[in-house]
């Protein structure tokens, strides 16, 4: 009841200020209408985001773009989404910059333009936006709109991985294991595979199993390999099931050899 009362009072104060043209109050009122379980009203959220966006508030511009892009509180309109993302991006809103890059890459509300997409991904990544950092790493690693440059791929994967991006951690582990863009470092590969695995990434779990099975970056340990393969199977990794069978077959052969000795 206390929270409900506080929210009711907040809406009252924000509304007074918003109606007098206060952009931050308009933004906050929009946010309440978009997020409050008891007062959710996307149409009102869009209305107030638009008021603040037209006054130049980059957060409101980003939120309004998101609403247009997702059809929340307003009919879906990719062109308006891209427009408002650009308005926010020009004011250095990092996630708006990433989303604008995505719009240009995918032709969402704008003509497809990979060069422009990469410019915006880069601006966003330099501000520390995690998805932009991963995406830029992937583009460098796969030659998407540029020459393949594995050293730059590793650079951007590392930035995203350090912020907890699971797929960046997985890909960074692969780079360290295979010496792509960085010298081979199996210990470092295992470190990043473990971080991704701890976040529930099934491929990383399988890769940790492989590290234990083959002694990559750690002492070879069939029992640990089996445990990680089982985790990977439980998370839907099909290769791990095959690896388990191979491991069981290997252990069976070793038992036979021991008994023959």
Give the residues covered by each predicted segment.
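Short helix-capping/linker turns of helical repeat alpha-solenoids
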Residues: 1, 6, 19-22, 35-36, ...
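Hydrophobic face of amphipathic alpha-helices that form TPR/SEL1-like repeat modules
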Residues: 3, 28-35, 63-70, 74, ...
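Terminal, low-structured helical/coil segments at or just beyond the last alpha-helical repeat
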Residues: 234-261
């Amino acid at each position: 009841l206390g929270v409900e009362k506080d929210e009711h009072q907040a809406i009252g104060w924000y509304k007074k200020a918003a109606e007098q043209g206060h952009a931050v109050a308009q933004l906050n009122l929009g946010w309440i209408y978009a997020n409050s379980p008891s007062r959710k009203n996307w149409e009102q959220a869009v209305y107030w985001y638009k008021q603040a966006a037209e006054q130049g508030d980059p957060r409101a511009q980003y939120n309004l773009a998101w609403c247009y892009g997702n059809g929340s509180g307003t009919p879906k309109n990719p062109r308006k989404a891209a427009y408002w993302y650009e308005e926010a991006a020009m004011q250095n809103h990092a996630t708006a910059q990433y989303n604008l890059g995505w719009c240009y890459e995918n032709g969402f509300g704008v003509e497809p333009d990979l060069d422009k997409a990469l410019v915006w991904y880069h601006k966003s990544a330099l501000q520390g936006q995690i998805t932009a950092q991963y995406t830029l790493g992937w583009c460098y690693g796969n030659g998407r709109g540029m020459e393949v440059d594995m050293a730059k791929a590793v650079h951007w994967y590392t930035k995203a991985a350090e912020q907890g991006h699971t797929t960046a951690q997985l890909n960074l582990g692969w780079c360290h294991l295979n010496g792509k863009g960085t010298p081979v470092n199996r210990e470092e590969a295992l470190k990043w595979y473990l971080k991704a695995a701890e976040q529930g990434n099934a491929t990383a779990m399988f890769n940790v199993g492989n590290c234990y099975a083959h002694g990559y970056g750690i002492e070879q340990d069939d029992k640990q390999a089996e445990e990680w393969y089982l985790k990977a199977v439980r998370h839907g990794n099909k290769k791990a099931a095959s690896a388990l069978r191979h491991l069981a077959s290997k252990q069976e052969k070793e038992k036979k050899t021991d008994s023959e000795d």
